[in-house]
């Protein structure tokens, strides 16, 4: 890589489904899914803490007909991730589950049920088609970002895509028995070096790979390193991105037998960069897991990705960052902007016009367009919320219309 006249490094990390923070996310989203399965309009905001021998679930819920067995849901989630033995220090059967869930604040509920705009409308105005999605207000204030880039087929930044691939591969090899000594907790980090910005670089390589994986007590670090180099890295990292200068740090701290909630306390919402774009772009600060789609922290971040991805898929830019901001209790965003980093085939101002014409970022409209009141969230909890075709916000169904409108 020394031949590069300019060297720019881009690093992203991923953590496995058994990482304590990700386990907390998975529990929270499993509870959310069960409420939505029983009652799609449930309001849910659930946080989870996991530590040695204990899980604590707290939050606010509003549901009229749903009756969720929280204890059962938590234990089933822990079982699915792989904490099945008491000697892990945390397991599905014997760990305690403490529940402190109460009803959603009626003041917040009122502002979400009927937005400020809706309350100010006459009955005649409420019947107009353009106001159909104005009834529901945003569940909180805040700013959310969505991003897309043409550096990978899934229109995601390369470093985070590679890092997620490594942790997903570790889970596959653990679950299929190929590497039986692997345990649920793991992390991976990938540093990519380029001779310029992602959209202008002509040379790209992987500079550094870091893998830290929990393991049984009876395996050597030499064996782990050999298996990572044989079974994990080649299955994920394209050979053309590796060279003789690529560095590999495999369990650089040494033994990693004590892991998961027994090694570190986990909390919902602590891996927001892992969940999104790996640090490639700004983050508004709001976490996703455990929140129903009236919470714009989640739904608007998904929608911003949807908008950005369609812009890039339409060929209107090589990179697109979309920012949406809200006021609590109001339906319409207070602001929406796009930044294409100078890669647009039309101006950012033109893209603003196209977004206004082809997208609707009111919370109720987002929920309807992406069909978000479904039990689809537990599967988002690990390996990133973006770049995965199974999710509705990854559709590029508006790209052609955007392209045609831009040419018109």
Swiss-Prot record:
Its Enzyme Commission number(s) read: 2.5.1.6
A family per Pfam: S-AdoMet_synt_C
Q: What is its main location?
A: cytoplasm
Q: Name one GO biological process term.
A: S-adenosylmethionine biosynthetic process
Compartment(s) = Cytoplasm
Can you quote the record's cofactor note?
Answer: Binds 2 divalent ions per subunit. Binds 1 potassium ion per subunit.
Key word Amino-acid biosynthesis present = no
This entry carries the following GO cellular component terms, namely: cytosol
The metabolic or biological pathway listed in the UniProt record of this protein is: Amino-acid biosynthesis; S-adenosyl-L-methionine biosynthesis; S-adenosyl-L-methionine from L-methionine: step 1/1
Residues bound to L-methionine are 60, 104, 264, 295
SUPFAM superfamilies documented for this protein: S-adenosylmethionine synthetase (SSF55973)
Q: Which NCBIfam families match?
A: metK
Q: Which family does it belong to?
A: Belongs to the AdoMet synthase family.
Binding partners and assembly = Homotetramer; dimer of dimers.
Record-given protein name: S-adenosylmethionine synthase
Task: List the source organism.
Answer: Deinococcus radiodurans (strain ATCC 13939 / DSM 20539 / JCM 16871 / CCUG 27074 / LMG 4051 / NBRC 15346 / NCIMB 9279 / VKM B-1422 / R1)
Q: Gene that codes for this?
A: metK
